[in-house]
């Protein structure tokens, strides 16, 4: 679906836009409030260790600093581009909600143990606000949320250098979490499939009526 770029005043005049924006913000806040308890349960469950020939051949290194520099620069770029474009922002928020729900489902269905040689990936912000628990969360594996987030932003921004930059960041993050042994190779390779599904579903959630507007130059 091609997204026109309405201004905020034009979008805000549409009751459907206001309703959907309010709904997705409330749902994201509700989900965020439940994630600490859910991830603590995920961490407490026993799981399987998967064979991973690539990780077995790849020495583990702590690249947390570089990983989160790329992630937060990418998020900053994506948010900066999306904030002046309310319809793109709305679809991105619905897709992000869908992505988290899909990830909660896959974590429920596929309990896994961390890859051998895991080097703990430390994110002070998320560890304190989302994954807050007595012990670090290491079993939130299938699929890679870090990789998926940047790829989702790449889909949400307009075509151009910013999309290419976010795609490059996605590849970098997928590589870095493997170097860290924070994810299995399967987690990284599966992320684009779930991003594509969440993005497609977000188009249906927002509805075509919101996009019947003349695109800005």
Predicted segments with their positions:
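Aromatic-anchored segments of alpha-helical transmembrane domains
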Residues: 30-34, 100-106, 170-181
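Hydrophobic alpha-helical transmembrane segments of polytopic
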Residues: 67-71, 93-96, 166-169, 173
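Membrane-embedded alpha-helical segments of multi-pass membrane proteins
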Residues: 66-74, 144-148, 189-193
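N-terminal transmembrane-helix/juxtamembrane module of multi-pass inner/ER membrane proteins
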Residues: 2-75, 112, 123
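C-terminal membrane module of polytopic membrane proteins
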Residues: 190-217
């Amino acid at each position: 679906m091609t997204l026109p770029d309405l201004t905020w005043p034009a979008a805000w005049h549409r009751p459907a836009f206001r309703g959907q924006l309010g709904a997705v913000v409330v749902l994201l806040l509700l989900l965020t409030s439940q994630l600490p308890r859910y991830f603590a349960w995920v961490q407490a469950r026993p799981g399987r260790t998967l064979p991973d020939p690539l990780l077995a051949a790849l020495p583990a290194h702590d690249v947390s600093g570089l990983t989160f520099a790329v992630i937060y620069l990418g998020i900053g770029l994506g948010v900066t581009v999306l904030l002046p474009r309310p319809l793109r922002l709305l679809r991105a928020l619905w897709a992000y909600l869908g992505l988290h729900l899909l990830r909660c489902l896959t974590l429920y269905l596929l309990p896994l143990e961390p890859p051998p040689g895991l080097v703990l990936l430390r994110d002070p912000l998320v560890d304190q606000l989302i994954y807050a628990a007595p012990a670090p969360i290491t079993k939130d594996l299938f699929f890679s949320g870090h990789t998926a987030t940047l790829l989702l932003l790449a889909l949400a921004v307009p075509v151009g250098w910013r999309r290419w930059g976010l795609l490059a960041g996605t590849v970098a993050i997928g590589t870095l979490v493997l170097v860290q042994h924070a994810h299995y190779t399967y987690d990284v390779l599966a992320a684009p499939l779930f991003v594509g599904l969440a993005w497609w579903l977000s188009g249906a959630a927002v509805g075509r009526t919101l996009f019947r507007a003349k695109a800005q130059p």
